[in-house]
Each structure stands twice: as C-alpha cells, then as structure tokens.
Amino acid sequence: MITLKEALKYSKEELENLKKELNEKAKKEKKLGAYIEQFLDKDLSVSGEGVPVAIKDNISVKGWELTSASKILQGYIAPYDASAIVNLKANGFSPFGRCNMDEFAMGSSTASSCYGKTLNPLNFERVPGGSSGGSAAAVAGGLALASLGSDTGGSVRQPAAFCGCVGFKPSYGRVSRYGLASYSSSLDQIGVLTQNVEDAAILYDAIAGYDKMDSTSANIEFIKTVPNLNANKKLKIAVIENYVNDADSEVKNALLKTIDMLKANGHEIVYKNLLDSKFDIAAYYIIATAEASANLSRYDGVRYGKRSENIQNLKEMYVNTRSEGFGEEVKRRILLGTFVLSSGYYDAYYIKAQKARAFIKAKYEEILQDCDLIFMPVTPTTAFKFDTQKSPMQTYLEDVYTISVNLAGLGGISVPVAKDKEGLNISAQLICKAYDEQTLLDGALSLEQMIKN
C-alpha cells in the first residue's frame, strides 16, 4: 500500500485509478466490515479530486448519509461539511468511504453498530477495537491509505493498537468539532489513523487549526508539524511504571524492551506513577454519560433520522422512536448519564467526577513540567475475542490507559512496537503537553524508526 506522502505526488489520473482500485478491493473484502456496506454500492471513485481518506460515520460530509452507526439516524443526509472535511479538501484530500463504528462512538469493539460488527484484519476472531474500529481496520487491512476517526476516551488510539496502525489524537480543541456528531462534548476530538507517523503528521496538518464555528476550538497559533519533524531530537520521557507493570505479561515485556531501546537511542528515561486507574474510569464514565444524555436528547423523531411508525400521540413518538432507534449500550449510557445528573445525585456523582478530573489533569501537568513526553501502554491486553467480555465493566476497562488523556485534554499517539505470540499487535502510547504535538510526533517518529531498524 502506498503512503499518503507518496499519493500526494500522484497525478489526477493516477488518483482516479487508485480510488477505483481501493473501491474494488473494499467490495471484495466486505466480510471485514471496515466500510458500511450500503455505501460501497456507490461509486466511491467520484468522491471528488484529491488523495482518498476514509471517514468515520459520525463526521459530516455534505450529501452523505451520517448515522453514527445507529438506526435512529438512518436516512439523515448531512447538509454541510464538517470543518475538518473543509480543511481536508482544501489541502489536496477527498473523503472516500464511510467507516463502521460503535453506535454513537460508545464502545471498544465496533460490535454495537447497527450495520453489524467489524473484524480485525490481523485475526478475524478478534475485535478491531472501538469506537473507530472501521477506520482502523480499513487502514490496517489495506482498504484505505488513511482515515479520520474520533477519540472520546481512546477511540482512535485503542483500535489502532489492536489493528496495528498509527492512531493520533490531538489535544482537545486543536481540530474543530464542528460537524462531528457529539457523544461527550468536553472529551470528543477528531483524530487520524494512518500507516505511519509521518502520514499522521501530514493528515493532522491538513485538518488542524482554529475554527470560529466551534466555541471549544483552541485559538492558539498552529504551526505545521511536517516541515519540522525531527526523529533525532533527544527527549526526556516519563515512563508510567505502575501502568506498565499492570499490563498483561506479553504487553509488559514488549514495552520494557521498547523502553530499553529508547534509552539506547539517547532518550532520557525517568519513572513516574499516575493515580490508580479506578479514579479515571469513574470520572470518565460519569462525565461522558452525563454529556451523552444531554447530547442525545435531540434524537426524538422530530427533526433527525427515523421516526417510529407505531405512535398515537407525542409521548409515544418520543418513547417508541428512542426505544426502537437506540441500541442497548447507548440506552445504558443515557440512563446512567440521566441518573448522575438527577437532583438527588448531581453533587454525589457529577460534581465529584469533575473534581477528580481536575486532579487527574493536575497530575499530568506535574509530570510534564520537567518531562517532554509520557510513555505508557495503550491497552492492558492485545485484541480480545468477540463475545468474551461478559459485562459492560469488562469492556470499559479496555480504555483504562487512554481515558485519562481525554480527561486532561492532552495529545496522545499509539505506535506499533511488537507482536505477541499469536501475531497480534502491541503498541506503545506517547502523551504530550497540551498543544505540543510537534514534540509528540518527533518522539513517535523516533520510536517508529527505532522499531523498524
């Protein structure tokens, strides 16, 4: 598979041939479920001029159906381009194909989609991760040069780690959320999934920057990262020792070897600890579900998508539309979010979760005061088998090392470093100070080149 960097040098005719080739390949690999099948019936080669980039099903592309992999939004056609898509097109890229995802980005396996599950291209019995599992599977499976996803608590980095590609979540506000179907507004961030770190930098440079259409967009000077990429920069890296030690033995051993390589290549390694991850999980699922219960209240059968036909009055329209339209996991999170925001529990849960979030952010800032980057696992295990997570809590624990990065609003990247005995990918996660993506990408490029050599 050619890289984004190589494809940007293609002529218009070469790009058209590439798109036709990718389209045919995607149709042959329908079993993988990386793309939403109904979308493959369209001629994706006419998606516009530019290098093709696959798009997660919660990012608006004008004229495309946007469903967030939910029955309740089927039939909704986006009337405008998301700001990230506007920037994408302005920089020589074109949207190409709708990637499958967990419904409303709520999940870690891409098994809750109303279109059916996505498989892991490394092993069809394993999950691709989520919620951007389709985006990761498309890139890792050779069906896309790169893709856009969204990351609320690890939804770009975790599937990238499970499928064996690079997953990069910029700092909160660095990429506009205008045109992204909201799950949790204070945590959501559009990210990129690519074949390598340089491509991640190229795609990030194309979509990042301040946007007046998004009130949470960071009005901070944005300097392109690609011209300044430097894999030879020597960095001070804080290894989160308690997280590395708590990971599965194969993941732990791979990360320890990676740390030794970083030392051997001249990076300064120091050892730090973060809070017990149970605080991250509690704070994240209270805040995220509270915001989701508010954001998803707009899907009631009045303005968007499907409306139940089995109705006699207004109340039945609301109840039946939402009962029929939302999947089990989405209903679970809406109920939890409504509960923690209720008058009797707001102080006991939501306010305490926000205090915990501030504490988590302060701990990261303390470590990053005298370190350039943080190093830790992306996931505690490699990709798990379908239907082995017996409870929602087991599924939630898959994001244990990624959610705190969103709570703190920092940038994070997942880089493949090893394979386990079954050939499944193991990745390392690097984390930077807010809006210091240049250092993050420099460190990731250094790590990637070390692994290749």
Swiss-Prot record:
SUPFAM superfamilies: Amidase signature (AS) enzymes (SSF75304). One of its GO terms (biological process) is translation. It catalyses: L-glutamyl-tRNA(Gln) + L-glutamine + ATP + H2O = L-glutaminyl-tRNA(Gln) + L-glutamate + ADP + phosphate + H(+). Gene3D superfamilies: Amidase signature (AS) domain. Its EC number is 6.3.5.7. It is an enzyme of class 6 (ligase). It comes from the Bacteria. InterPro entries: Amidase, Amidase_CS, Amidase_dom, AS_sf, GatA. The active site is at K56 (charge relay system), S131 (charge relay system), S155 (acyl-ester intermediate). GO terms for molecular function: ATP binding; glutaminyl-tRNA synthase (glutamine-hydrolyzing) activity. GO terms for cellular component: glutamyl-tRNA(Gln) amidotransferase complex. Allows the formation of correctly charged Gln-tRNA(Gln) through the transamidation of misacylated Glu-tRNA(Gln) in organisms which lack glutaminyl-tRNA synthetase. The reaction takes place in the presence of glutamine and ATP through an activated gamma-phospho-Glu-tRNA(Gln). Heterotrimer of A, B and C subunits. Belongs to the amidase family. GatA subfamily. This is Glutamyl-tRNA(Gln) amidotransferase subunit A. The gene is gatA.
